Curated annotation (Swiss-Prot):
Biological source species: Bacillus cereus (strain ATCC 14579 / DSM 31 / CCUG 7414 / JCM 2152 / NBRC 15305 / NCIMB 9373 / NCTC 2599 / NRRL B-3711)
Family: Belongs to the RnpA family.
Lineage, highest ranks first: Bacteria, Bacillati, Bacillota, Bacilli, Bacillales
GO molecular function annotation: 3'-tRNA processing endoribonuclease activity; ribonuclease P activity; tRNA binding
UniProt protein name: Ribonuclease P protein component
NCBIfam families assigned to the protein according to its UniProt record, in alphabetical order: rnpA (TIGR00188)
Job of this protein: RNaseP catalyzes the removal of the 5'-leader sequence from pre-tRNA to produce the mature 5'-terminus. It can also cleave other RNA substrates such as 4.5S RNA. The protein component plays an auxiliary but essential role in vivo by binding to the 5'-leader sequence and broadening the substrate specificity of the ribozyme.
GO cellular component terms, A-Z: ribonuclease P complex
HAMAP family: RNase_P
A GO BP annotation: tRNA 3'-end processing
Length: 119
């Protein structure tokens, strides 16, 4: 499956990141911190990614971002719309496989009620 994070699904501007940090709610597990901000007027969700330089060099950070984007692409039908999310990767992500990243994201999304329940 290709990585397909269209422009409408991304947060890029610093002031948009800051709004989510300041006004949003956060949930975390050992691998990720996820901030969420409700935006009722928005027809879809948007994602912003942050991977600190403390985690590793550019190769490691970009690998983590690619895995998170791919997981979000696969989960996009299950993620609630009308919200902005900022996902911050923590140190343990550097050694994780794609399956572990996806499982961890599902865990933190379910924990905070951000993920739609599909039966």
């Amino acid at each position: 499956m290709s990585i397909d994070m269209k422009k409408k699904h991304r947060i890029k501007k610093n002031d948009e990141f800051q709004a989510v940090f300041q006004k949003g709610k956060s949930n975390a597990n050992r691998q990720f911190v996820v901030y969420q901000l409700d935006k009722e007027e928005q027809p879809n969700f948007r994602i912003g990614l942050s991977v600190s330089k403390k985690i590793g060099n550019a190769v490691v950070r970009n690998r983590i971002k690619r895995m998170v984007r791919q997981a979000i692409t696969e989960l996009k039908d299950e993620i609630a719309s009308g919200k902005d999310f900022v996902i911050i990767a923590r140190k343990p992500c550097a050694e994780m496989t794609y399956e572990e990243v996806k499982k961890s994201l599902i865990h933190v999304f379910k924990r905070s009620g951000m993920k739609r329940i599909k039966k």
